[in-house]
Amino acid sequence: AICTGADRPCAACCPCCPGTSCKAESNGVSYCRKDEP
């Protein structure tokens, strides 16, 4: 299974990798970012 790594744009094909979540950025693009502890 392919997942989207941290600091990469969220992709419909590939969920964010474990430990990261899709977060909307100020430029309107959503990126997978590391979860905050």
From Swiss-Prot:
Effect of P9A: 269-fold decrease in toxicity to flies
Expression (tissue specificity): Expressed by the venom gland.
Intracellular or extracellular location(s): Secreted
Record annotation: effect of changing I2A: 7-fold decrease in toxicity to flies
A single MF term (Gene Ontology): potassium channel regulator activity
One Pfam family from the record: Toxin_16
Site (Important for the neurotoxic activity): I2, V29
Sequence similarity: Belongs to the neurotoxin 11 (kappa toxin) family.
Function, in words: This excitatory toxin inhibits insect calcium-activated potassium (KCa) channels (Slo-type). Pan-neuronal expression in Drosophila is lethal but flies engineered to express the toxin only in clock neurons have defects in circadian rhythm but a normal lifespan.
Listed name of the protein: Lambda-hexatoxin-Hv1c
Lineage: Eukaryota, Metazoa, Ecdysozoa, Arthropoda, Chelicerata
